[in-house]
UniProtKB/Swiss-Prot annotation:
Gene3D superfamilies listed in its UniProt record: Pseudouridine synthase I, catalytic domain, C-terminal subdomain (3.30.70.660), Pseudouridine synthase I, catalytic domain, N-terminal subdomain (3.30.70.580)
Gene, per the UniProt record: truA
SUPFAM superfamilies: Pseudouridine synthase
Official protein name in the record: tRNA pseudouridine synthase A
Family note: Belongs to the tRNA pseudouridine synthase TruA family.
Domain of life per record: Bacteria
A GO molecular-function annotation: pseudouridine synthase activity
Biological-process GO terms, alphabetical: tRNA pseudouridine synthesis
Catalytic activity: uridine(38/39/40) in tRNA = pseudouridine(38/39/40) in tRNA
Species name: Bradyrhizobium diazoefficiens (strain JCM 10833 / BCRC 13528 / IAM 13628 / NBRC 14792 / USDA 110)
Amino acid sequence: MPRYKLTIEYDGAPFFGWQVQDTLPSVQGALEAAVKAMTGADLRVHGAGRTDAGVHARGQVAHVDIEKQFPPGRFRDGLNAHLRPHPIAVLEAEIVPDTFEARFSAVKRHYRYRIVNTRANLALDIGHAWRVPRRLDSDAMHAAARRLLGKHDFTTFRDTECQAKSPEKTLDQLDVLRDGREITIITSARSFLHSQVRSMVGSLVWVGEGRWTADDLSAALAARNRAACGIVAPPDGLYLVKVDY
């Protein structure tokens, strides 16, 4: 039974997250329906990251085992045909060893968060970025972000319903870059807690607005208390960009 690795991009706006839902649209559910249309079988598609409702992906990775072996290009094209009109694209399909696990074989996940720092309404970026009208000091945000690098207990920055066994994570990258009115926050780690990226982004926005200092961010981290977190950024601006193996 061949195992296929799929590289996928999607617009998360119409979906209630990656994970399959009984009655609500999900990315996993749409992919599994496409696989069934090709194979006639109900098969589980396993993702590298269970993105929340409204979160997008440019490089989500998944794997699926199927009985029949298709040429990878044909399998990719067939899935894309059956996925229409969902805003999901299978960019690549390849046959991998059965030891490969999309989630557990991953060594690093890369996310990007888009902020449009403008008083004007969003037009083309609605649902794909967070509009923040108050002027943000991106240099202060970047400097404060240094405080979160490395291994920490990120209890403050995880959802109260997070099911991870440990709140400790090692943050390898957290950069804040400005290009005109757009601010991009780039982060990477082996894995993240539920809502960790959005919680860090929202707290950094408080730094950018002048509500918090870098010391306030450090104090929030040290508190190990969800109540100490700043605002949680909306899902619109978050993208799973790449998964390393």
